[in-house]
């Protein structure tokens, strides 16, 4: 029995097998590259107690979540840099942020700060203010309950 060979001297059955192996190796390689890239971009979430007990390496991007401690919010002379303390009832972490703060960012409110540790201070690049289920946007604050319900009904 004499099998026909493809133009390159490889049997068609073996040629398909070689192509399958090459495709599989390329797919695995792409998956490993994607996993490596994502692991370097991931921001781990910490609460102050976890951050104090097990700090990440300096300069690693993380998220810090907790409550802005009352009496800790201070604005620097430049007018856009603020210092405050984030706590979780067990530990406190000083935070520095330069930029415009979210409207809901006030002392005693929840916050998620994205940034990195520099020494003992967390330097935030971004602030996300958290609110409770009773939040009412500033624009809706002057509306009556019936008007607010009508607006909500329109969005459903």
Swiss-Prot record:
Organism: Novosphingobium aromaticivorans (strain ATCC 700278 / DSM 12444 / CCUG 56034 / CIP 105152 / NBRC 16084 / F199)
Compartment(s) of residence: Cell inner membrane
Record topology, Periplasmic segments: 38-156
Similarity comment text for this entry: Belongs to the CcmE/CycJ family.
Annotated TM spans: 17-37
Entry GO CC: plasma membrane
Residue intervals annotated with topology Cytoplasmic: 1-16
Keywords, alphabetical: Cell inner membrane, Cell membrane, Cytochrome c-type biogenesis, Heme, Iron, Membrane, Metal-binding, Signal-anchor, Transmembrane, Transmembrane helix
Protein name (database record): Cytochrome c-type biogenesis protein CcmE
BP term (GO), one: cytochrome complex assembly
Membrane topology: Single-pass type II membrane protein
SUPFAM superfamilies assigned to the protein according to its UniProt record, in alphabetical order: Heme chaperone CcmE
Protein function: Heme chaperone required for the biogenesis of c-type cytochromes. Transiently binds heme delivered by CcmC and transfers the heme to apo-cytochromes in a process facilitated by CcmF and CcmH.
Gene: ccmE
NCBIfam families given in the database record: PRK13254.1-1, PRK13254.1-5
Annotated binding of heme, by residue: 131, 135
Gene Ontology MF, one: metal ion binding
